């Protein structure tokens, strides 16, 4: 039985998140003062028009904002720890294992030089200490779960050999591979 106080503890708390992009033309405040609270087992949808900061918010939570962007303010508390204060080595154990993300553009998220099965298997090897054979078996199971026909053969395909929809299914299969506590779908 779960303690009542434990059940009420947020899994994710984003407080006053501010992510800005520093360009030659000035500062773009892509995310400016976002607050989010997600409890275990809860589903939260963020909606808005194109360019309003939904993806930047998700990438900020994952600490995947690249230059010229930067999280300039706020807190991202995951299970009580501020992700913005974690060293990158510790963040790498959180990312993909405890928090996972389904990216919007599978063609740019999948590595074109590795077979899709290798990419899913790598996630399992790095975060869950699966052996090669166990990772291959689990990869095929995950591909089947997302409705990819002939999963054994598709695991051997390179990303460019898949349709856009099939590549998106690979991303959907990869994200929950390690049974994360939080899944972000962009």
Model feature map: region roles:
Residues 177-181:
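A short, proline-enriched helix->beta-strand linker immediately N-terminal to the Walker B motif
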Residues 120, 172:
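Hydrophobic anchor residue at the start of the ABC signature
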Residues 82, 134-153:
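Conserved ABC ATPase "signature" region
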Residues 157-162, 166:
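Conserved ABC ATPase signature
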Residues 83-100, 126:
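ABC ATPase NBD coupling module
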